[in-house]
Amino acid sequence: SYTGTLLSTNKQFKNDYPLSLFPSLFLTYKLNDKSDMQVNYSRKINRPNFFQLIPNFDVTDPQNILVGNPDLIPEFTNLAEISYQNQLSKKTSFLATAYYKNTNNLITNYQYRDKNPDPNAKPDTVLIISYANANTSYTFGLELTTKTKLTKWWDFTVNINLFNSALNAGAITGGRDNSQFSMFGKVNNSFTLPKNFSIQLSGDYQAKTILPPNSRGSGG
């Protein structure tokens, strides 16, 4: 649990977090010398950070004022994955992962227009950004990764993540349910240089999604 007092108004706030368990399971089955299957399950927690909890107005940007929410509770995520890995050749490997990720009480931000907290400032109403717990969110998809050693000094990796995500935000005033198919792709080049030097060049593409970037994938 945590407690706090906002000195400007002498307002006190308190929130109790229940005791929770976070089991994990990891199984591997070797199909042959070059390939194997893996099954993974885990439960994780993401607690709101200090700045998300403080009910104090941050007017650094007068047009976009931030305020925390002391009523935020942790979000809990259940993640299940099944993976297939194959060493296609001495130089090339392939990994495919199907996954399902469910989050309860997802911490998200939202905007609303309200009275300016500074009575001497203009305009009288401003856009305020705060945080709230959505009901639930889920993501399921397929992630494909291949790594190839093109030369002794050049490693080439491609990652493609195809997924569908949905968000139930009915707990937030003005919130609504939403779902969308999306994708993420990344290419990475790793070069080994003389005298133990190395360099990496990478690029990625993120299609439009309704969830934060760190919520898109298989949880890795």
Language-model features and meaning:
Residues 69, 73, 95-155, 159, ...:
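Outer membrane beta-barrel strand-and-loop segments of large Gram-negative receptors
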Residues 1-103, 190, 194-202:
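Structural signature of Gram-negative outer-membrane beta-barrels, strongest in the C-terminal barrel
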Residues 167, 180-220:
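C-terminal beta-barrel architecture of Gram-negative outer-membrane proteins
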Residues 1-4, 8-16, 28-30, 129-145, ...:
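Outer-membrane beta-barrel transmembrane domain signature of Gram-negative proteins
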Residues 99, 159-163, 202-206:
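Histidine- and/or cysteine-centered catalytic micro-motif in compact active-site loops
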Residues 2-11, 50-56, 63-65, 106-115, ...:
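Outer-membrane beta-barrel translocator domains and adjoining extracellular loop/strand segments
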Residues 23, 158-160, 183-189:
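One face of beta-strands
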